Every structure is written in structure tokens, then in C-alpha cells.
């Protein structure tokens, strides 16, 4: 093989290395796009096109193997083999059903493991099955069957001709250099291929290098610092497995690390790793910011990004937002981007089709469909919300169906199928008809949210559910859980997209353009022949339903991972803003790695070290690089600190998903000072949303109980008296409290003036509860017992005089009404001065005077945290009750 490995001592001065003249005009492959950008920024001889990423070239050279259509077919083939192979012949003492369940649950990892084995070209005769776990034996059996049958979807092209390699290079250069002069393109040499900065090799990368080396001189470059030899040892461990000599740079160029704080920290970390503690410089203490959790860290980053957006606006949007940020973030664990995507979705490139509401529709329908019973089965109620809110199901006003579903939720909550929900809604219609005809029932039940829905609204929801069933039936009518035709399924999805999206005028043109690109994508994979289980089909949706990428819509990650440090330190800061490099997530947990970081399940180091002798250099390089990933993270931190010619900041997250974590041990050894993050309090940009104002709203008539609401809280008065015109209870806690009061009042009226006999009253309460149970379906048996016992206890304590039920006076009726409206009404000695003022009675003239139309139209309906908030029917909208009084 024609492979040469060179090191360079300073990434800012590669052009001073003796070999630079021989490589500067060659076609070059980099480990990441950030390294491409950094090298092109730093060296005038480099430009995009001459330099590109390794992965982009692999996608071009191995276009079939890397295509989504092959990935889909591979998943289907493996899924069918999992069903076909008799694993009981391979694994003793474990049922085949358990094995199949395990393999299917981890289908994606299984596919990745099989692909790895094919990319490594593993020989079955060299695998020692006795040394494998039962899952690994199953994987090997699947691999063996695919090899035995020469499955066409697992055939990786090998034995390339030089013309094919040159064609792949030319095509890639042409795609990237559309705006570059043709003379420059023609001068790109293809006799030598330069590869930059790869530490984490994949098997397909190594195959590519081997193929290139048959016709080209492959020159591999990486940075090496003799002063940090223990830190850089990880690179030597990986590259020593190549069948090529490493030629070290003769230069030991001063990287001026001591001029910057980051360089001093890098020197100290390197000294610890080398065991040379005597040279550690403790003159300046390292400062580390401690974030309590990932959300707090995301909030800190979000503020920085928002400040950058403001500067960008002032600069007439001349540059991207990241250009204006005064901190550039690098994290050992970049999962915080998942939170930032919610804050700033446009920053992370074009949203995938499946991330749009209409995309959610297809995912949710698939989640709900049960292939065995052939019905839509609700495992997660949110799936139904997604289907009704996306725009596929017709509604006159956007959000109307979800609003109706919300109101009826407690009545239908126990149903598990869409058909069952539709039946339950018809039952609700009958109940509403019965209640409407009975004045007393209407008075009592109007405060329960699902009885505050109109018959036409329920009909709309039933029609929507029927339409959802029809669409689903169209998708899955000829499906079962055995072999399903993917081609037929996705053709139907395309038909629905055309009918429900492209042909609908109300949907904006921007989203229609995305749908057109999804349809184009479906057209590209329309000939994929894949038949597999329904679960496998669900997993392929991410591959099928993605749009062809739009121009200039790539992601600009706000927080970058450590693999991107090497290129970014080379970028020239052309903005007027001084940059700080912020190295984040520096905890022991985040700086270490999991087994998943090393190999896909069920493969592990034991599989590669024990099950098969490492007979091939590619095999050795791959395994070594995966095992060295932990040390690579450590190297990346030191590299970033050493070559960052700017201010630096360090931080870690204290509370992670798996519990509390500690600062990275090397920083603890250096006696780093940990300072908890204290957010700056700045309310200037916050929206004042603690009140609402209305203008020329048509007011109805008010009574003294409306005035009581007004005294309690203007915001509550607006929602209950003006908007809803009554108190409507929406959550189970308040509804159960209300039902308790209803039972108490029924008993008081029924037994008025009669002697209290506990058993008789208890039986009466149970009878009334049984009568209500058919209407209040959210109350279970245990709840009913609690409600009856609570009502009985109240009656014994407050409704008796000399062993008899008290007569109900006008004053008592007034008190009962107050309890039904406010769920509490403290009077007399039990009430404080504020409550006495709130619940005092008023004449109608007093009500009209205080609640005049002029007053109400000029009023600011402000939230007011008070002792009655916990029983407010609007508390989940207002949210004031969830605040502490101190706050």
C-alpha cells in the first residue's frame, strides 16, 4: 500500500513543514467540515473543493452502500431473517421468542453491527463462536445467512478501477467548486490524496483508504506535540496499526501557549498526565463555572445567542448570528443542542419533514396502528392530539378539534381505541340531551367541563375521528404484521400529501415546497423492494419521509462537540467582537464514554479481541481507535486550550440524567475553583403578561357572585364571568371537590329537618354517588368511597343541630351557592378580613355600579395570587397558584 504518515507540530504553520510543497496542490480529505473551513481560512493555497470531508467522498465513492434505499432494504432483510432463523439451534436455555424480541427491540443497532462486520470483511472461519455472548451468536448467524445467500443489499463494491476513483473525485470537486475558476480546478492533483486529522476511523473509511492506496499515494497528516507526548500518545497508538511508518516533524515550533490562559492550563494538564507534577504552575487558579443542570446551561447559551441576534439586526443581518457571539461553545457532551433546537429551530438548518406537524401525523398514526387488531390503538394520548392539530384532518378554525378534545378528555380518557372514543362521544351527546331537559341536573353539571361542550362541537370531533379512521384504513387496509409492502405504503402516503397538502390553498407555499421535495424523495426510493414487519416499516419512516435538502439550509450548531475544535481554532476572527472559547460539560461523566460510544450493540471489545484474531490492519486500526475515544476527548480538550489564541472559559454541569457528577478529575487535581452560575437578572426584555385589557367587549348581565369574583381576582373575573360566564372545572382534583359539595348539598336538602342516622345518610350518599358515576366517568371506585366519606364527615360537622339536619334558610342557600362556585367560602369567625370583604353580599344596584361597562372596558385584568387560587377553575391558564408567595 502507498501510504505515508506525516506529523506537523503547529497547525498554524503546516506550510513550514518540509513536505508541504508536495501536498499543497493535492485533493484533500478532512475529518470534519470545520477542519475544511479552518484550513481554507488559514492557508491561501486551500479552498473548498480542493478540500472536502472524508464522509462526503465516501458517500460519492460508495454511493450504493451509503444510500438510503440500500439502508431500507438492509433493515427489511435483517428483520425477515430475525423471523426466519431458528435461534433455538444456536442458543441454549433461552427461548427463541426472547431472542427475537431482544433483536427486534434493538433493530437499528443490529443493522449497524451487521454493516460493521461487512465493512470489515470479517471471515466466518476466523470467528470463535464459543467466546461469544448469546446475542453475538445470533448476530453472527444473521451475518452468516446474508453471506451464504449473497444478499445483494450487503454487497460492498471493491476492486475499484482508477478511473472510477478519479470520476468520484471529479464529480465531488465539480459539485463543490461551482464558483471557482476552472484553471484552479484543473490544477488540483489527483495522484496523491491527503487526509487530515482522522482519529476515529470507521471501517468504511479504512476500506476507502485501502482502495485509494492501490493507485494513489495516500498522505495522512495529524498534529503531534513532543512537549505533550503523553497526551498525543493516543494518536500514535491508533496510527501504529497502519502498515506505514510515521514520519515526525523535524520542527518543534513554539505554539506560544504560555501567552494565553488556555495554553497554561494545557501545559499543566499535560504535566499531570506525564507524571511530571514538579513543573505545574499553580500561580493562577483555574476558574470553572458550575451549571446546576442542562436547562440552566442552555439558558445561559440562549442569552448569548439572543445578544448576538440583536447585534446582527443592528448590522443589517450582514453575517450569521454566530459571527456576533462573544463566546464559542465546545462541549464534551453536546446534547444541550437538543434544548437549543427548541429555542432557535431555524439555527439548526431546515427542519426535517417529520418534525413538522404534518410529519407528526404520519408518525402518530403509525404509533397508534395495531396490526393485530387492525384498529387505531391509543398508547399515548398525545398521538391523537398530533393527528387532530396538523391540518390533515379538516377543521373550520385551526385548533378547534384539539380544543374540543381537551374539553371532553375526562369523559373519554379510559378508552384505548379511536372507535371506542367515538362511541363514548355519542354517549356524551345523549347525556347532554338528558341534562338539558332537567333544570336541576343542568345547574349541577354545567360546571363540569365536558358538559360545557355543544352537540355540534361533539359531532365535529366524531367526524374528525371517522376521517382519521378512513385515512388510516387507506394506509393499512391490506397490512398485517408479517410481510408488508413498503412501496405500496409510501405510495399511499404520497397520495395523501398531494390531496391534503399540495391541493389545499390555505397551506403556505413554503411548506408546500418542502412537501414537493419529500415527494421527490419518495419518487427516488419508489422502486425499493422491501417487505418486512410493521415495526420495521415504522423505523424506515425517518429514511423515506425526508425532503431533498434545500440550498444553503445546513445546520449551524450553537454548541459544537470536541471533534470540531481542531478546525475552529484555525478560523480567523474577522468580527469586531473579541471571542472567548468556552469548553463545557467538563465533568467526569461527560469526559468518559459509554459502551455505545465504542461499538454498536451487541458488539463489544470482547467480540473484537477474543472472538477473532486481528489478522487485518484495518481491523486493528478500527478497534484501537474506538478504544482510544476516551483519550481522544482528553487530547481534544488539551489541543483546544493550547491553540486557542483568545480568552477561555471552563464549565461543567452538576446534575445530569444519571445523578450528580463531579468536575473532571484532572481539573480537580489542579485545584480548580468552582463557582456556581448566577444568572443575571434583567427584566427589561420580558413581556409584561400579568394582565389583559379588553376593548369594547359586549358584556352580559352580572350578579353578586360575579362581583365576588371581581374582588378576588380581576383576571379570574375576566375568564369566569366574562368569557365562560360561569365556573367550569377542568381537572380531576377540583371536579372531585365539586362532586363532594354536590353530594353534601343534595343530602342537606333531602334530610332537611330530619334526624341524623349515620347509616341511612351513608347509604343515601352512596346511592347518589352511584347515580353520578355514570356521568362522571373519571371517578373510580376508590375515589367514590373517598368522596362519600368526605361528604359524610362534613355533614356531621357542619350541618347538624341537636342531632338533626338544620333547616335551609335563605342565608344557607346563599352559602351553598358560594361553595359550588368557589369550592370554599369561609364566613364568620373562620374567615379573615379579606375573605369577609370578598364574600359579602351586594344588591343588584351595587353590582351594576361597580361592574359598569365603562369600568370593565378600562380595567387591567391583572392576576392576583391569593388564598383562593388553589380552587380556581382557571389556575392552569393563569399559573399564578404555582408561584411561591415569596416570589
Regions found by a protein language model. Name each.
Residues 619-671, 852-875:
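C-terminal accessory regions
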Residues 738-812:
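A non-catalytic, helix-rich entry segment at domain boundaries
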Residues 33-188, 203, 392-430:
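Basic/charged alpha-beta structural segments of nucleotide/phosphate-handling enzymes
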Residues 27, 32, 51-57, 61, ...:
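Conserved helicase core region in the C-terminal RecA-like lobe
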Residues 42-50, 56-60, 274-285, 308-449, ...:
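ATPase/helicase motor core of nucleic-acid motors
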Residues 128-242, 290-294, 569, 579-583:
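Conserved helicase NTPase motor core
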Amino acid at each position: 500500500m502507498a501510504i505515508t504518515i506525516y506529523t506537523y507540530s503547529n497547525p498554524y504553520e503546516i506550510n513550514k513543514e518540509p513536505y508541504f510543497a508536495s501536498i499543497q496542490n493535492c485533493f484533500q480529505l478532512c475529518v470534519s467540515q470545520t477542519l475544511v473551513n479552518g484550513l481554507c481560512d488559514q492557508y491561501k493555497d486551500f479552498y473548498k473543493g480542493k478540500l472536502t470531508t472524508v464522509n462526503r467522498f465516501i458517500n460519492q465513492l460508495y454511493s450504493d452502500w451509503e444510500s438510503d434505499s440500500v439502508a431500507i432494504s438492509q433493515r427489511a432483510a435483517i428483520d425477515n431473517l430475525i423471523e426466519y432463523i431458528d435461534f433455538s439451534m444456536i442458543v441454549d436455555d433461552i427461548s427463541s421468542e426472547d431472542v427475537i424480541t431482544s433483536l427486534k427491540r434493538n433493530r437499528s443497532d443490529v443493522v449497524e453491527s451487521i454493516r460493521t462486520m461487512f465493512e470489515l470483511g470479517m471471515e466466518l472461519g476466523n470467528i470463535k463462536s464459543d467466546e461469544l455472548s448469546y446475542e453475538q451468536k445470533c448476530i453472527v448467524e444473521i451475518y452468516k445467512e446474508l453471506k451464504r445467500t449473497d444478499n445483494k443489499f450487503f454487497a460492498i463494491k471493491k476492486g475499484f478501477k482508477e478511473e472510477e476513483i478519479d470520476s468520484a473525485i471529479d464529480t465531488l470537486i465539480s459539485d463543490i467548486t461551482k464558483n471557482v475558476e476552472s484553471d484552479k480546478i484543473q490544477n488540483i492533483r489527483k495522484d496523491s490524496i491527503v487526509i487530515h486529522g482522522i482519529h476515529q476511523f470507521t471501517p468504511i473509511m479504512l476500506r476507502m483508504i485501502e482502495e485509494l492506496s492501490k493507485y494513489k499515494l495516500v498522505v495522512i497528516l495529524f498534529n503531534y506535540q513532543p512537549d505533550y507526548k503523553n497526551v498525543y500518545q493516543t494518536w500514535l497508538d491508533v496510527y501504529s496499526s497502519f502498515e506505514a511508518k510515521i514520519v515526525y516533524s523535524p520542527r518543534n515550533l513554539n505554539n506560544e501557549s504560555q501567552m494565553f490562559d488556555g495554553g497554561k492550563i494545557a501545559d499543566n494538564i499535560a504535566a499531570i498526565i506525564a507524571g511530571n507534577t514538579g513543573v505545574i504552575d499553580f500561580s493562577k487558579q483555574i476558574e470553572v463555572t458550575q451549571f446546576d443542570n442542562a436547562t440552566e446551561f442552555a439558558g445561559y447559551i440562549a442569552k448569548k445567542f439572543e445578544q448576538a441576534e440583536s447585534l446582527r439586526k443592528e448590522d443589517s443581518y450582514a453575517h450569521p448570528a454566530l459571527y456576533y457571539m462573544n463566546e464559542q461553545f465546545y462541549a464534551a457532551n453536546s446534547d444541550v443542542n437538543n434544548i437549543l433546537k427548541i429555542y432557535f429551530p431555524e439555527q439548526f438548518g431546515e427542519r426535517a419533514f417529520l418534525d413538522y406537524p404534518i410529519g407528526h401525523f404520519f408518525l402518530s398514526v403509525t404509533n397508534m396502528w395495531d396490526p393485530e387488531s387492525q384498529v387505531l390503538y391509543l398508547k399515548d394520548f398525545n398521538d391523537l392530539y398530533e393527528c387532530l392539530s396538523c391540518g390533515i384532518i379538516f377543521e373550520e378554525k385551526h385548533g378547534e378539534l384539539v380544543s374540543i378534545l381537551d374539553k371532553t378528555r375526562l369523559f373519554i380518557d379510559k378508552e384505548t381505541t379511536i372507535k371506542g372514543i367515538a362511541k363514548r362521544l355519542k354517549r356524551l351527546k345523549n347525556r347532554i340531551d338528558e341534562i338539558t331537559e332537567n333544570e336541576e341536573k343542568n345547574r349541577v353539571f354545567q360546571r363540569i367541563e365536558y358538559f360545557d361542550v355543544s352537540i355540534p362541537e361533539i359531532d365535529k370531533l366524531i367526524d374528525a375521528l371517522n376521517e382519521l379512521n378512513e385515512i388510516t384504513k387507506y394506509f393499512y387496509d391490506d397490512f398485517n404484521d408479517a410481510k408488508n409492502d413498503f412501496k405500496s405504503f409510501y405510495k399511499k402516503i404520497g397520495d395523501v400529501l398531494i390531496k391534503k397538502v399540495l391541493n389545499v390553498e390555505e397551506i403556505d407555499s413554503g411548506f408546500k415546497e418542502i412537501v414537493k421535495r419529500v415527494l421527490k424523495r419518495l419518487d427516488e426510493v419508489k422502486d425499493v423492494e422491501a417487505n418486512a414487519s410493521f415495526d420495521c416499516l415504522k423505523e424506515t419512516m425517518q429514511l423515506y419521509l425526508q425532503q431533498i435538502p434545500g440550498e444553503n439550509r445546513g445546520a449551524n450548531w450553537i454548541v459544537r462537540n470536541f471533534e470540531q475544535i481542531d478546525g475552529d481554532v484555525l478560523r480567523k476572527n474577522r468580527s469586531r467582537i473579541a471571542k472567548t472559547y468556552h469548553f463545557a460539560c467538563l465533568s467526569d461523566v461527560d469526559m468518559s464514554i459509554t459502551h455505545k460510544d465504542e461499538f454498536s450493540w451487541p458488539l463489544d471489545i470482547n467480540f473484537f479481541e477474543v472472538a477473532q484474531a486481528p489478522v487485518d490492519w484495518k481491523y486493528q486500526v478500527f478497534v484501537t481507535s474506538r478504544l482510544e475515544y476516551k483519550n481522544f476527548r482528553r487530547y481534544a480538550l488539551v489541543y483546544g486550550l493550547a491553540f486557542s489564541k483568545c480568552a477561555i472559559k471552563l464549565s461543567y454541569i452538576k446534575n445530569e440524567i444519571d445523578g450528580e457528577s463531579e468536575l473532571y478529575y484532572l481539573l480537580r487535581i489542579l485545584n480548580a475553583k468552582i463557582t456556581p452560575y448566577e444568572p443575571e437578572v434583567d427584566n427589561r426584555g420580558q413581556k409584561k403578561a400579568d394582565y389583559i385589557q379588553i376593548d369594547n367587549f359586549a358584556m352580559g348581565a352580572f350578579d353578586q357572585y360575579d362581583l365576588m369574583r371581581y374582588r378576588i381576582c380581576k383576571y379570574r373575573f375576566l375568564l369566569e364571568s366574562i368569557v365562560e360566564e360561569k365556573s367550569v372545572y377542568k381537572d380531576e382534583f377540583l371536579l372531585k371537590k365539586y362532586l363532594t359539595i354536590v353530594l353534601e348539598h343534595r343530602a342537606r336538602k333531602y334530610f332537611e329537618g330530619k334526624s341524623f342516622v349515620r347509616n341511612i345518610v351513608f347509604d343515601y350518599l352512596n346511592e347518589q354517588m352511584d347515580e353520578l358515576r355514570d356521568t362522571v366517568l373519571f371517578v373510580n371506585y376508590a375515589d367514590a368511597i373517598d368522596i362519600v366519606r368526605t361528604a359524610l364527615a362534613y355533614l356531621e360537622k357542619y350541618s347538624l343541630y341537636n342531632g338533626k339536619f338544620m333547616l335551609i334558610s335563605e342565608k344557607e342557600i346563599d352559602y351553598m351557592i358560594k361553595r359550588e362556585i368557589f369550592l370554599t367560602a369561609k364566613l364568620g369567625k373562620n374567615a379573615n378580613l379579606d375573605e369577609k370583604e370578598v364574600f359579602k353580599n351586594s344588591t343588584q344596584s351595587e353590582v351594576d355600579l361597580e361592574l359598569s361597562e365603562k369600568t370593565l372596558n378600562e380595567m387591567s385584568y391583572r392576576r392576583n395570587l391569593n388564598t383562593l387560587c388553589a380552587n380556581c377553575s382557571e389556575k392552569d391558564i393563569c399559573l399564578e397558584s404555582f408561584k411561591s408567595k415569596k416570589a
